[in-house]
């Protein structure tokens, strides 16, 4: 569980296999929407043969610290692969940082720690610059 029983859980309404609605009653906030998306993805990962999921840093930014901690615990419980990309690990709680440090496979940073050794969005010396 992400929250105790005082919070409303996300709901999925299926309509004859042609469409669906996925929402959290009375909460249309961005953080709640992204948290619900993560829970949905984890449910699909657990209940299907899908071997892995990936979550980008964008979906974590508006989720509070306590729910992020619980999401990290759920990630740890999975027997399947989960790939996540996070910016600014210092922005997360000590619990989440600890989980990330124990389980990280790859750390990327500026200054030589980029994938393939360089930043793709910067001009090199042959391209000129300001």
Describe the predicted segments one by one.
Residues 48-63:
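Conserved P-loop NTPase "ATPase switch" module shared by AAA+ and STAND
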Residues 29-34, 62-66:
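Active-site-adjacent loop/helix micro-motif of nuclease/hydrolase catalytic cores
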Residues 68-130:
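C-terminal lobe/lid and adjacent interdomain/linker elements of RecA-like ASCE P-loop ATPase modules
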Residues 1-2, 40-43, 75, 96:
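Hydrophobic, Leu/Ile/Phe/Ala-enriched alpha-helical segments that form helix-helix packing faces
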């Amino acid at each position: 569980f992400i929250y105790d029983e005082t919070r409303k859980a996300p709901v999925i309404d299926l309509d004859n296999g042609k469409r669906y609605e996925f929402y959290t009653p009375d909460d249309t906030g961005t953080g709640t929407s992204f948290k619900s998306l993560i829970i949905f993805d984890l449910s699909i990962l657990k209940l299907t043969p899908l071997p892995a999921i990936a979550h980008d840093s964008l979906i974590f930014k508006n989720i509070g610290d306590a729910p992020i901690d619980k999401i990290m615990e759920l990630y740890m419980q999975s027997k399947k692969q989960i790939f996540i990309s996070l910016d600014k690990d210092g922005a997360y709680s000590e619990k989440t940082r600890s989980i990330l440090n124990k389980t990280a496979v790859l750390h990327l940073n500026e200054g030589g720690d980029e994938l393939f050794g360089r930043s793709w969005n910067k001009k090199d010396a042959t391209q000129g610059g300001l």
